[in-house]
């Protein structure tokens, strides 16, 4: 199916980036934690447990009184939400006919009870759903959110809940003198890529280590003389001092070589790391001999293949520090 453009933004709620379903009022038939699993939902006919057919999703009991069912998700990457997907895959006679989505921004780590007492902002009003379908809803909001609440009307099952958006890091939680300028959780984002046949380039800058090959970025095999690449807008203008190119899990399909280029406008590029040989299944760390200010990074791999993670350690410039802090303040006020 053709997906909206905003679905290319990272999933801020995914378990892979630290998201958590902190509460649900009911999960009799299927657990709430399934909502944010990064894998696509599965269905195994004739797999029955003590409560009936086993579903890969969140499913509540049939309501016999007025009301709705709800689940609260703590975003692994707080940020600006551009859209949500309520995926009812494999729920046919038991999907909710309607859903709505709200959000809240709060410091610290409040309990479910404390969260429920807050004033929530509507991102998606009560809207009709289709069964066994991805139901996308674009969100128009410029605020930074930390928690999202999914309400289903009146009950039923949802396989996955995706919250796409742009991460906005809290500068109070970072040492702005030295950190990963290319980290998704700090506000970096992929702006372009030559190929994403096997997996998304967003994986390159995701938190933590890749646990399997599928959690990295892998391109199709090239049959021409070109090479693959990905471009990233960094968390802020900075001066990098160390690059990490991680090919963990990629053995017969790692790139043979890679290079890094930098830019202050995303158009004119200069060399950061010359074309350098890579080894399969290896974390490579390269000190950068002549660090320069940059706000964009381009990774070229030769000729194709896969990479688990890309890190770029350094400090923000004065302008980068100012823009980083202002972005957070602007997203706080919306």
Language model region names:
Residues 50-54, 110-137, 203-222, 269-288:
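Intrinsic, low-complexity N-terminal interaction/targeting segments
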Residues 1-70, 74, 166-235, 251-253, ...:
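Disordered, acidic Ser/Thr/Pro-rich linker "stalks" and the adjacent N-terminal cap
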Residues 94-107, 253-265:
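Short, surface-exposed beta-strand/strand-loop-strand elements in extracellular ectodomains
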Residues 158-169, 312:
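Short, structured interface segments
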């Amino acid at each position: 199916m053709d997906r909206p453009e905003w679905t290319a933004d990272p999933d801020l709620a995914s378990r892979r980036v630290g998201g958590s379903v902190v509460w649900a009022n009911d999960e009799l038939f299927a657990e709430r934690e399934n909502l944010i699993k990064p894998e696509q939902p599965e269905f195994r006919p004739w797999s029955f447990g003590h409560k009936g057919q086993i579903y890969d999703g969140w499913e509540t009991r049939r309501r016999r009184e007025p009301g709705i069912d709800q689940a609260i998700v703590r975003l692994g990457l707080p940020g600006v939400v551009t859209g949500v997907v309520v995926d009812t895959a494999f729920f046919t006679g038991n999907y909710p006919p309607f859903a709505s989505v709200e959000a809240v921004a709060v410091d610290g780590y409040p309990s479910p009870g404390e969260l429920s007492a807050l004033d929530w902002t509507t991102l998606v009003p009560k809207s009709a759903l289709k069964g066994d379908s991805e139901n996308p809803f674009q969100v128009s909001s410029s605020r930074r959110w930390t928690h999202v609440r999914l309400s289903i009307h009146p009950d039923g099952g949802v396989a996955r809940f995706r919250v796409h958006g742009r991460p906005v890091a809290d500068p109070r939680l970072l040492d702005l003198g030295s950190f990963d300028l290319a980290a998704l959780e700090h506000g970096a984002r992929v702006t372009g890529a030559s190929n994403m046949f096997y997996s998304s380039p967003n994986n390159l800058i995701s938190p933590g280590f890749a646990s399997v090959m599928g959690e990295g970025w892998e391109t199709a095999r090239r049959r021409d003389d070109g090479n693959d690449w990905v471009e990233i807008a960094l968390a802020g203008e900075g001066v990098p001092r160390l690059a990490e190119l991680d090919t963990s899990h990629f053995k017969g399909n790692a790139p043979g070589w890679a290079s890094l280029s930098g830019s202050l406008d995303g158009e004119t590029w200069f060399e950061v790391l010359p074309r350098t040989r890579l080894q399969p299944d290896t974390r490579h760390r390269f000190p950068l001999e002549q660090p320069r200010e940059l706000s964009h990074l381009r990774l070229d791999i030769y000729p194709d293949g896969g990479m688990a993670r890309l890190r770029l350690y350094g400090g923000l410039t004065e302008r980068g520090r100012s823009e980083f802090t202002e972005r957070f303040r602007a997203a706080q006020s919306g």
